[in-house]
Every structure is written in structure tokens, then in C-alpha cells.
Amino acid sequence: MNDINMRDQADKLRNLARKSAVDSSFDTPCPRMIVVGGGKEGIGTSTLAVNFAIEARRQEQRVVLVDAHPTRGDVAKLCHVDHPWTLSDVLTGQCSMIEGIASGPHGLQILSGVQKKPLSEDLTEFTYRRFFNQLTRLNDQADLIIVDIGEAASDTATYHWSAADLVCLVTT
């Protein structure tokens, strides 16, 4: 049963990657974007994303770390950041991208993930286009955007795959 389940997850990831390779709808220039995702919960995507971000800061890059995990945000906890705004607030228009970003350790800029309730699966394509449009406006404050999407086999992950310059899949 587990082998079948793992194959199903891997198939979903491959299909998402294929679909995003064809979809080039996010053609507005923005800082280089790395998306980190995995095949299942709890395999360390947040830890890897935070470490990528810290290493990029050591190389004097300006980094925005976005926690886009749809069900729980761990990046802020790992970085000991407490900020009133989250990704949910940016997506629903309750705050701007700039307002949502908090200062973190090592000079990281962090957009915290969801804390109380999961992201709604019915967020529209327009919502994500608006979100990525706001990311493009970060040219003045970011050289690199690192996005932790957690379990990568969600419908919303497609938007992140499509916008990424580089995708890092964490496997077990």
C-alpha cells in the first residue's frame, strides 16, 4: 500500500512539473525564484528552504523567504519570527506584500505561512496572479526569493512551479 501511495505522490509531482514547464504565463521579470517542495509532510522542506536562504545571505544576496505551505507554516517558527501578517493576509488582500514581510535572522526577509487555518483551495488564479505580481515588485529589495511549498502535490503548487527559476524536490 505504501509503495502505491508513494508512486501516486511521485506521479502527481511529475505531472505538476510537466504542466508548469509548459505554462509560461508568469513572464514578468522578478528576482530569481527557488521553490522547495516535497512528496509528503515532514521531510524537511522548511528546514532546507531556511538553510538555502541563510547561505544566500552569507553570499550577500538580498533574500525574501516565503512560506507558502498550504496547511501549516513552519518557516517563522524556525526563524523565531513573530509577525501579525501571513501569506493568507497577502493573498486575501488584507495587507500588501511589503506589509506582510518581517525581518528575520541574518537579514532575511520573511513572509510567514498560515498559522491558524489552511489556505483555502478555492483561491482563484487571479489571486495567485496578483500575488506573483506583488513578488515582481520586490526587485528593489530582493535578489532571490525562496518559496517553501511543503507537500508539493497540491493544486496551488502549480502556480509556484510555474513562476520558479529552479525547483528543488525533497525526497526520502
Question: Model-predicted segments: where are they?
Answer:
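Structural motif
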Residues: 62-64, 108-110, 145, 167
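Short loop/turn elements that form and flank the Walker-type P-loop nucleotide-binding site
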Residues: 29-30, 59, 104-105, 140-142, ...
